[in-house]
Amino acid sequence: MLNLNKLFEIIEIDIQNSKKISELDKIRIKYLGKKGVLTAFMKKLKDFSYEDKKKHSIIINKKKQEIISKINIKKQKLSVYILEQRIKSETIDISLPGRRTEHGGFHPITNTIDYIKNFFLKLGFQSINSPEIEDEYHNFDALNISKYHPARDSHDTFWFDRNRLLRTQTSSMQIRIMKQEKPPIRFIFPGKVYRNDYDITHTPMFHQIEGLIVDKNINFSNLKWIIYKFLYDFFGKEVLIKFRPSYFPFTVPSAEVDIIDHNGKSLEILGCGMVHPNVLKNVNIDSKIYSACAFGLGIERIAMLRYGITDIRSFFENDIRFLKQFKYN
């Protein structure tokens, strides 16, 4: 009996020292389970006399009920404690300011394209998407760039086969639209173009916007007026603009347009010119009746100038720190 009393004391101490509900379950199994200590003690009572067996059975069963009761009480206390700790850890201070909701923003290239499109739509232009995979005829031949023309070398073309390629310029859409539409024509063609070049000012994929006007009595003065109007709107009226003669196979005369920075340095912005009579002939437009002008500009280049970006690759690296700067522009 002394050993039994000592055992009950040990069980009570174990229950009191328990810090987890799982520990209480282990105590219950250890002492009260089928293979538990008290169960084993009960089996030994068969060797006792009838009176001793009866006496000890009553004591043990009473203690078992007390142990079960104490385990349940301890479980309730631990459950309350765990809940209190959880509530404490998840408490929200309602006096603190709420978390600011982040809003998405457009990529600076998308912003620039949308700005340019909106400007030309106000002037009566229509905007149309165009295929990025082209054939040799629309990308080169119809634009007065014949098979062995040296201008092809500067395009660094990605070829799929002998006829299909990733377009090197949005000018290819000029041919398609002039074959589909009858003059007067006034369209812009924004889109991606591809050239095999990669450095701080070039990427294998970049964006262009091509503009085309076909009508009677269109001249270079009309073209200059449109370009001045656009550049003043985009960069501000204080910008200095310079036209200089250039050469493109599909326009004649041709010019490149520069803006002059605060250091007096010329920065090329776009190319333009009157559409070559051979190009009009290729789309069955009579150059004696109609004339046409065209211009093309690189979106990344003017975005770099507008936002003061020095490396074109920054547009395509998806650095959130970089992109966040343009969220509200």
UniProtKB/Swiss-Prot annotation:
**UniProt source species:** Buchnera aphidicola subsp. Acyrthosiphon pisum (strain APS)
Please list the reactions this protein catalyses.
tRNA(Phe) + L-phenylalanine + ATP = L-phenylalanyl-tRNA(Phe) + AMP + diphosphate + H(+)
Reported EC number(s) for this entry are 6.1.1.20
**Entry GO CC:** cytoplasm
**What keywords appear on the UniProt entry?**
Aminoacyl-tRNA synthetase, ATP-binding, Cytoplasm, Ligase, Magnesium, Metal-binding, Nucleotide-binding, Protein biosynthesis
GO BP, one annotated term: phenylalanyl-tRNA aminoacylation
List, alphabetically, the Gene3D superfamilies matched: Bira Bifunctional Protein, Domain 2
What's the top EC group for this one?
ligase
A GO molecular function held by the record: ATP binding
Q: What is this protein called?
A: Phenylalanine--tRNA ligase alpha subunit
